[in-house]
Regions:
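C-terminal, active-site-flanking charged/polar segments
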Residues: 358-359, 371-421
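Short beta-alpha connecting loops at secondary-structure transitions
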Residues: 236-239, 268, 299-305, 364-366, ...
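Conserved Class I SAM-dependent methyltransferase catalytic core
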Residues: 28, 243-250, 265, 309-383
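Conserved S-adenosyl-L-methionine
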Residues: 172-286, 291-293, 302, 310, ...
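Gly-rich Lys/Arg/Thr-decorated short loops/hinges at beta-loop-alpha junctions or inter-strand turns
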Residues: 164-167, 295-302
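Conserved nucleotide-binding/hydrolysis micro-motifs of P-loop NTPases
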Residues: 42, 204, 245, 272, ...
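Non-catalytic, mostly N-terminal accessory regions of nucleic-acid modification and defense proteins
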Residues: 1-193, 264-275, 364-368, 390-405, ...
Length: 498
């Protein structure tokens, strides 16, 4: 979580936009994101130049020499944040509007990169030089605080806090997934260097970014010292789809600022016939919309064959199974209703997971995980596509704490089940002797089938009732009589004083 001072600076930046006449939250977050990208472009270019120098490799800066726009040219160095942020307001505005912004919208001239696809219609909306100057100063201060912070992922937390200002609740049934929950799911799935990873409802690409960061931490040498695997990581590993062009723009920039140059981020209604993907991905990480609007006529027919429904949370599960290759794995968030819903469609998709594939884990999460934006109760489902069954025992875990208070404040706390969840999931042999009264345990497939494929942990968890010994009736009556006498004596004493 970011510090109070950093939060205050971000809130202050928001106030600067409001005072300058830009009040639409989506416009504000877009403009901030563009400016953060421009700042990070300068930093990443410097970093890559240093890395190339250390390895003795040639490197050509994107800011070298002159930049040409039509018949005009400008020194490329003037497009760097570290240079133009010292310009007077009027000159800074002119350089930003006429040079820097067109430069970033045409950064990849081939128009095939995820970034350039959705920058074509991007517009620089800051109305005055004074507003731009104030915003640049505010961002410089925010970056200073981020650089001073000891937090591991302060930039990600800062960006998450920025995104939280888009609205107080999800649009179209989508809620921002907390970063620590995303990280937990990524660690549970342990992505490999040859994985092909997809989020069919990617939003700002949080799952894809986290998977990329995890691979950098755990598979760095395997990926970055092998030309073929590095090419796969940069160009062929990450796929994200969404129906919101603004989210796609932000998601593409999010990926690029995390060092993934060319993810496949595309506009697509994943549930419709325009999504042709079948048996393509080895790993799906997702938190699909729960109650989004749905045009039933556009839903792909093969998804309706699995479960005939208008509920997006069920259709997305059918979609994940279709998009995964045999042996492919999935970790996804679902609302609790998916686990125990009694409709034909609910039972059909649960039966398909249990009987037709290999359901591995159901991790129930407390309702406060998505606060303050939503109070919905959710669970993480983990399964492998086999096409012919394979479920033996399903692992259940009852998460009661995630490291933050479960109220609207979401303050950090000592109670955190996430490290225990990750450790136990990766050491299943230690779970076989666990009892139903404990926080995690296995349930045999047949027992699940016998219970209409109910996947709610409360169906199988046993609660130990500790007997409470109460005093005998005679003792209670004696105590009451004693109290009565004390009250009477007190009243008599009070009357004597009047």
């Amino acid at each position: 979580m970011i510090t109070g001072e950093l939060k205050n600076k971000i809130d202050g930046l928001w106030d600067v936009f409001a005072a300058g006449g830009l009040v639409n939250p989506l416009d504000v977050i877009e403009q901030i994101t563009y400016l953060m990208f421009i700042h990070d472009l300068d930093d990443s270019d410097n970093l890559r130049a240093k890395e190339a120098a250390m390895l003795g490799l040639p490197y050509t800066s994107i800011f070298t020499d002159e930049v040409q726009m039509g018949e005009r040219t400008i020194d490329g160095q003037q497009l760097k944040w570290s240079v133009f942020h010292d310009f007077p307001a009027g000159k800074m505005y002119s350089v930003m509007q006429e040079w820097v912004f067109p430069f970033i919208t045409n950064l990849h001239g081939d128009k095939n990169s995820a970034y350039s696809k959705y920058m074509d219609d991007a517009i620089f909306k800051l109305p005055t030089p004074l507003l731009l100057s104030k915003v640049v100063d505010a961002l410089d201060e925010i970056y200073r605080l981020m650089n001073e912070s000891q937090a591991v992922d302060v930039r990600g937390d800062t960006y998450e806090y920025l995104l939280s200002k888009i609205s107080q609740s999800g649009r179209n049934g989508q809620f921002r997934t907390p970063r620590h929950i995303i990280r937990m799911m990524v660690e549970l799935m342990d992505p490999k260097a040859d994985d092909v990873i997809c989020d069919p409802a990617c939003g700002t690409s949080g799952f894809l970014v986290s998977a990329g960061e995890y691979l950098k931490e755990h598979r760095k040498e395997e990926i970055f010292f092998n030309r073929q695997k590095k090419d796969h990581y940069m160009n062929h590993m990450f796929f994200g789809y969404d129906m919101d062009r603004t989210m796609l723009r932000i998601g593409a920039m999010n990926m690029m600022t995390h060092g993934i140059d060319n993810p496949f981020i595309e506009y697509r209604d994943s549930l419709s016939d325009q999504n042709p993907d079948k048996e393509k991905y080895s790993l799906i990480l997702a938190n699909p919309p729960f109650k989004g609007s749905l045009d039933a006529d556009t839903v792909s027919a093969d998804l309706l064959k699995v479960c005939k429904t208008k509920k997006t949370e069920l259709l997305f599960l059918a979609l994940f199974l279709r998009m995964l290759r045999i042996g492919g794995r999935c970790a996804c968030i679902v609302p609790d209703g998916v686990l125990f819903g009694s409709s034909t469609a609910h039972k059909a998709i649960r039966k398909e997971l249990v009987d037709g594939n290999r359901l591995e884990a159901v991790i129930s999460m407390p309702s406060g995980v998505f606060k303050p934006y939503a109070g919905v109760s959710t669970a993480v489902l983990i399964f492998t596509k086999t096409g012919h069954g394979g479920t033996d025992n399903v692992w259940f875990y009852d998460m009661t704490a995630d490291g933050f208070s479960l109220d609207d404040k979401r303050s950090e706390t000592q109670e955190n089940d996430i490290p225990d969840i990750i450790s136990r999931f990766h050491n299943p042999e230690q779970e076989t002797a666990r009892q139903r009264t404990e926080q995690s345990f296995f349930v045999p497939k047949q027992e699940i089938a016998d219970n209409d494929y109910d996947l709610s942990i409360n169906k199988y968890k046993k609660v130990e009732y500790v007997p409470v010994e109460y005093p005998s009736t005679a003792e209670i009556m004696a105590d009451l009589h004693e109290l009565e006498m004390e009250i009477t004596a007190g009243l008599e004493e009070l009357e004597g004083m009047l």
